[in-house]
Amino acid sequence: MTLKKLNPITPGSRHRVIIDYSKQSKLLKPSTKNAPLKKNTLKIMTTEGRNFHGVITTRHRGGGHKRLYRIIEFNRNKLGVSGKVNNIEYDPNRTANIARIHYQDGSKKYIIHPEGLEKGANIIASAIAPLSIGNSLPLKSIPIGTEIHNIEFHPGKGGQLARSAGTGALVSYKTNSFVTLKLPSGRSRYFDNKCWATIGKVSKAEHKFINLGKAGRSRWLGIRPTVRGSAQNAVDHPHGGGEGKAPIGRIPSTPWGKPALGIKTRHRHKWSERFFKGLKKK
């Protein structure tokens, strides 16, 4: 995939950067003509960032285009059943594309589309599956140096890690019970070797270079404007108030007065810290 910067014909296209699919192989190009699988979609009601009390718990959410949720098979539980990639589709609910799989038993499912998985390719989930892109195996069956995605935290729960566009983890070390993976963040973590993962990294790695070009496209995605703290009143934000433009005048803070910008927010005594013990970030 390559990137394309649009000419500044209009204000909205001045800084617009998109993914150019015109030079890509037809076997890897996502299709927008086919409707999503009816049995694999759900209607989702947006909460506009509010909880059940109506209080805003996540700011800058609201609006957006109406969409159907595609049910993704994160838990590849059709063991030993081969499936064929029928189509590659756009998913409005995630950064990566998705692949429509037609299994030999007649069922149809969606999976996260790995980079390089072509239309017409066959995939399978098995402990003795070949190390081909899109195949799912337990970590104990995956050799060191393999790039993987859709990784389980707990055996049988379904993939929860490395699912966004362009992400992948690397198998770096193996013991009798655990496998060490280098995560997209750069940290290494221990995983139970009975957890399953999918071979390859997620497609659409160029997503991080996309520039929406105008505010309206953010609103289509359900993202509302973010107002700088220094532009607010003192009653609304610790950075607010003052005459004209004023410096922060204190430690950079969140709207609730907690330290911001570079402060670690992960709890040092969280139970899962044991899986990082003795492993340094590289």
Swiss-Prot record:
Superkingdom of the organism of origin: Eukaryota
UniProtKB keywords: Plastid, Ribonucleoprotein, Ribosomal protein
Matching Pfam families: Ribosomal_L2, Ribosomal_L2_C
Biological process (GO), any one: mitochondrial translation
Family: Belongs to the universal ribosomal protein uL2 family.
Places the protein is found: Plastid
Region (Disordered): 230-261
UniProt GO MF annotations: RNA binding; structural constituent of ribosome; transferase activity
Name the record gives this protein: Large ribosomal subunit protein uL2c
Chief place of localization: plastid
Quaternary assembly: Part of the 50S ribosomal subunit.
Keyword rRNA-binding tagged: no
Cellular component, GO, one term: plastid
